[in-house]
């Protein structure tokens, strides 16, 4: 009797163990299938969109079939982060799958593909995701989709009419650098539109402050500089950056080559506007600015900087403004250009540059500066 009871207990234990193993198998299998579906652009069992109608991740399209409309949605699973900074968030246990998913996502997210163009209804759902979700990887995916669509002129008006500008601008308050960069890219694409620029001007001061205080040479800083450059293509909003010009010169001196070129594009927009000439001349410039004129510096950096100086020199009448020169402080760009001999020594230092265009630009700049600053001494 005791032996039969032992056999019964063993049998019961085996049955319970087998059942538990099966449950664990089904659970892990279900998770794996959900991940594979999301990697293929399908739907997962995630719900983070709040109460917004149609903003569920498995409800991008009104149809349940595999139509072209549903294929046009770009889905970025949590382990398929795009960009160099996103690698820190990749899941170690899914590294191989993440690589495959990332390639598939990047292919589908190509701006050259018509599959990424969303309808107004789909754009509304994406905006609803941006507004309601708090998860970084969901925000990043939605912002990438918006950025791709904002590259098309006809979508810029649609996104604005759907209330997308303040929704995306609100993301600028996030501390996540990846999400913040994607939001700046969306706003940059939208800012090509004149009406969008008029509405985005209220965020310029915030973008300017964030750009200056961001980590040097970071993706967020570069994205902010690109947006500010777009916003200053016309003269209408350039005055809003007047108090930050000194900071831009500081970024120019301290930044790497990519940052230097982006700052120069922004300063060139300002230098072409005669109304901004005094603000540029008032700006404090680092003492290291002159050291940029050397043969080792990038040719494009030298040429753009010389063009900026030429524009300022052309727009500012040195003789007419001589009585007001005391309004420029020591260390300003005005005194950098006023000290002709020092500036000449710096520029003459690259006259032996092997590039012919650099030599021509240097000669042109020196002649103009001498003519405008010392007209009487040349008579």
From Swiss-Prot:
Keyword set, alphabetical order: Cytoplasm, Membrane, Mitochondrion, Mitochondrion outer membrane, Nucleus, Phosphoprotein, Repeat, Signal-anchor, Transmembrane, Transmembrane helix
One matching Pfam family: Arm_2
Mitochondrial intermembrane side: 1-6
Key word Protein transport present: no
ARM repeat boundaries on the chain: 111-151, 153-192, 233-272
Biased amino acid composition, Basic residues: 95-106
Transmembrane segments: 7-29
InterPro entries associated with the record: ARM-like (IPR011989), ARM-rpt_dom (IPR006911), ARM-type_fold (IPR016024), Armadillo (IPR000225), Armcx_regulator (IPR051303)
Any single GO CC term annotated in Swiss-Prot or TrEMBL for this entry: nucleus
Residue positions, PTM Phosphoserine: 61, 67, 72, 110
Spans annotated as Nuclear localization signal: 89-98
Cytoplasmic topological segments: 30-379
Residues covered by region (Mitochondrion outer membrane (MOM)-targeting sequence): 1-6, 26-37
Any single biological process term in GO: protein localization
Localization in the cell: Mitochondrion outer membrane; Cytoplasm; Nucleus
PANTHER family: ARMADILLO REPEAT CONTAINING PROTEIN (PTHR15712), ARMADILLO REPEAT-CONTAINING X-LINKED PROTEIN 3 (PTHR15712:SF8)
Assembly behavior: Interacts (via ARM domain) with MIRO1, MIRO2 and TRAK2. The interaction with Miro is calcium-dependent. Interacts with SOX10.
Record function comment: Regulates mitochondrial aggregation and transport in axons in living neurons. May link mitochondria to the TRAK2-kinesin motor complex via its interaction with Miro and TRAK2. Mitochondrial distribution and dynamics is regulated through ARMCX3 protein degradation, which is promoted by PCK and negatively regulated by WNT1. Enhances the SOX10-mediated transactivation of the neuronal acetylcholine receptor subunit alpha-3 and beta-4 subunit gene promoters.
Entry similarity comment: Belongs to the eutherian X-chromosome-specific Armcx family.
Name of this protein: Armadillo repeat-containing X-linked protein 3
Gene giving rise to this polypeptide: ARMCX3
């Amino acid at each position: 009797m005791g032996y039969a009871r032992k056999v019964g207990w063993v049998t019961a234990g085996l049955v319970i163990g087998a059942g538990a193993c099966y449950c664990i198998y089904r659970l892990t299998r279900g998770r794996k299938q959900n991940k594979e579906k999301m990697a293929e652009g399908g739907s997962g069992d995630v719900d983070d969109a709040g109460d917004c109608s149609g903003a569920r991740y498995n409800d991008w399209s009104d149809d349940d079939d595999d139509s072209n409309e549903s294929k046009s949605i770009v889905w970025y699973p949590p382990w398929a982060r795009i960009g160099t900074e996103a690698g820190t968030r990749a899941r170690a246990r899914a590294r191989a799958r993440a690589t495959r998913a990332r390639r598939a996502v990047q292919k589908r997210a190509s701006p050259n593909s018509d599959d990424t163009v969303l309808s107004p209804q789909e754009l509304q759902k994406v905006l609803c995701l941006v507004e309601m979700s708090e998860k970084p990887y969901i925000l990043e995916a939605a912002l990438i989709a918006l950025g791709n669509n904002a590259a098309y002129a006809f979508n810029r008006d649609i996104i604005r009419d759907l209330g997308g500008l303040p929704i995306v601008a609100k993301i600028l308050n996030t501390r996540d650098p990846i999400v913040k960069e994607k939001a700046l890219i969306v706003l940059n694409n939208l800012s090509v539109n004149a009406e969008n620029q008029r509405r985005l001007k209220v965020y310029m001061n915030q973008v300017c402050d964030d750009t200056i205080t961001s980590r040097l040479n970071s993706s967020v800083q570069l994205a902010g500089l690109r947006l500010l450059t777009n916003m200053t293509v016309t003269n209408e909003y350039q005055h809003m950056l007047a108090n930050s010009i000194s900071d831009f010169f500081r970024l120019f001196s301290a930044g790497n080559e990519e940052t230097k070129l982006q700052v120069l594009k922004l300063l060139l927009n300002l230098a072409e506007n005669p109304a901004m000439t005094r603000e540029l001349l008032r700006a404090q410039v680092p003492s290291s600015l002159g050291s940029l004129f050397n043969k080792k510096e990038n040719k494009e950096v030298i040429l753009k900087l010389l063009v900026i100086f030429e524009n300022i020199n052309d727009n500012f009448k040195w003789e007419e403004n001589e009585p007001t020169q005391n309004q420029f402080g020591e260390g300003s760009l005005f005194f950098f250009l006023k000290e002709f001999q020092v500036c000449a020594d710096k520029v003459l230092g690259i006259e032996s540059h092997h590039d012919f265009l650099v030599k021509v630009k240097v000669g042109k700049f020196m002649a103009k500066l001498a003519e405008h600053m010392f007209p009487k001494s040349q008579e």
